[in-house]
Amino acid sequence: MTSATATQSTVVDNTVTGGGLLREAARIVSRPITSTWQWTVPRACDITPSWIGGDGEFTEGVGANGQRALRRRFTDEVTMYASPVESITAVMQAAGEAGIAPRVIESADDEVISELLPEAWRPAKLDELRDTRLLLHALDARRSVHELDLGSRALTCARSVVQRSLVRDVFVMRERCLEEGIFLPRNVDGILGELKPFLDAAGALAHDPVLCHGDGAASNLLIDSTDPDTPPLLTGWTVCGLRDPYEEAGSVLSELHLCAADDAQVLRRLGLDSQKLFIAQGFAVLDGVLWALIGLWRSKINSDKSIDCTKYGMWRLVKARYQLDTFPELNEWLEAQR
């Protein structure tokens, strides 16, 4: 057993918890779809260099009253790593009502129908987050998700909202890749081995979970290309749920580090302690490894082999390796553990 696999047994399984607002959102959004819609052909995916439309089938439609909508159908390929559909729809509903995501119209089974934004809206690109205004708006939107449980961080039992663990997710995906006979690049276990002190200390370093979007990719931001002052909206939500907020900060750093932001500034804007930057940086590296494994796994099991997820996965792994080598606070902490 390697040091990487040995850590897996220390990880706590996901549980289902949440707040009152989300419980009510789950009840409302779970009603059957009864409206009549006319749908176009599904949108094409764009996996390289982003992950646009890769977590489901997206189709535009028009209702009987002329209302334009976007249908997201969750496909089998995402079930291994995505939050449960009912958890995603509950959070999407709450975020839409809060004005930080497109409004959910209807939902049932494996489909979510939300409002279709005007054509000027599109997914953001990484280099656009060099714009300080857009970056701060994006971080504010993510922080707003933390408050969707009515501002209370005390978690009560509720239907639908899943609690996630990034450490657990990494090792589950690693095992699934091995079960599928997927060759793992040496950097996967190399990175996990170097992070062993961080993985061993994850329980002691953990913070109370809050509701999070969970994926810091720029493509999960919708921006109005005609008005840079309009706050962006969040999209995606594939790995949303209750989680350690430093995990989400890490996912944001995984996307932004050395590209568009000062790392400590990101934490402060998210309402987190910048003195604990090394924790977010450790999670940033793990987030890169997770999406590298997801990319490899999707390339193996996708029914449509024309969609190349491997390049995206390898891009994330290269970033993870580079960030592990260049995060000063994380490396200082790791050195102190030796």
Language-model regions: role of each:
Residues M1-R103, D110, D200, L205, ...:
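Conserved NTP-binding catalytic cores of kinases and kinase-like/nucleotidyltransferase enzymes
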Residues L21-V41, E147-G214, A218, D224-D227, ...:
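An alpha-helical support segment within catalytic cores of ATP-dependent transferases
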Residues Y246-Q275, V285-D304, K311, R316-L324:
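Active-site activation/catalytic loop segments of kinase-like enzymes and analogous catalytic loops
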